[in-house]
């Protein structure tokens, strides 16, 4: 859905154009931006700059604060891990937002993800599933982050453990994630995440520098 922002001169701009000028701080545009946040949740799209602009407008206009939009922005930022979007969003929260119980729950979920305690995350996510059921693709976005961590941590991993880390998924769903990440089966119980050929190999480079090459430079320093 295309969102156009109407300026005082009667002309219209896209949200991206509006965010590039002083109009991003105009509270008259907040409703349009909030609607844009809701569309991101519905359509599995993401615009960090627009979402941060909403939180900034809440800072300048606390009386316009919308907690439901706040929750959506924070949860959407989790879908872009391992990037630091959540930290940036959290830094813009007002004291009354920080004291909110749901905000604290989301912060706890973020902390759990950042320390890679994925089993606990899925347990907490199940308890609080109504909080993000309106966010399309939320679970798969988190699984993408889990896959990233697994890919940088393991060389091989047991299938049962991998299924648990990905949220207790079924075998058929596991197969799709194995294919998506380019992993391979090893026997019945193991998944090969990275081979030795995938590992980055360091190489020492030695360069011989003759005195004649630096003599003139050293003379200038005397």
From Swiss-Prot:
Q: Name one GO cellular component term.
A: eukaryotic 43S preinitiation complex
List the GO molecular function terms. ribosome binding; RNA binding; translation initiation factor activity
Output the Gene3D superfamilies linked to this UniProt entry.
ARM repeat, domain 1, Winged helix-like DNA-binding domain superfamily/Winged helix DNA-binding domain
The record's similarity note reads: Belongs to the eIF-3 subunit K family.
How does it associate, per the subunit comment? Component of the eukaryotic translation initiation factor 3 (eIF-3) complex. The eIF-3 complex interacts with pix.
Return the PANTHER family for the record.
EUKARYOTIC TRANSLATION INITIATION FACTOR 3 SUBUNIT 11, EUKARYOTIC TRANSLATION INITIATION FACTOR 3 SUBUNIT K
Keywords associated with the record: Cytoplasm, Initiation factor, Protein biosynthesis
Q: By its UniProt entry, which Pfam families does this protein fall under?
A: CSN8_PSD8_EIF3K (PF10075)
Q: Tell me yes or no: is Glycoprotein among this UniProt entry's keywords.
A: no
Q: Where would you find this protein in the cell?
A: Cytoplasm
* Protein's name according to its UniProt entry: Eukaryotic translation initiation factor 3 subunit K
The job of this chain, per UniProt, is described as: Component of the eukaryotic translation initiation factor 3 (eIF-3) complex, which is involved in protein synthesis of a specialized repertoire of mRNAs and, together with other initiation factors, stimulates binding of mRNA and methionyl-tRNAi to the 40S ribosome. The eIF-3 complex specifically targets and initiates translation of a subset of mRNAs involved in cell proliferation.
Task: Classify the main location.
Answer: cytoplasm
Domain PCI: residue ranges: 46-208
**GO terms under biological process:** formation of cytoplasmic translation initiation complex; regulation of translational initiation
Q: Which domain of life is it from?
A: Eukaryota
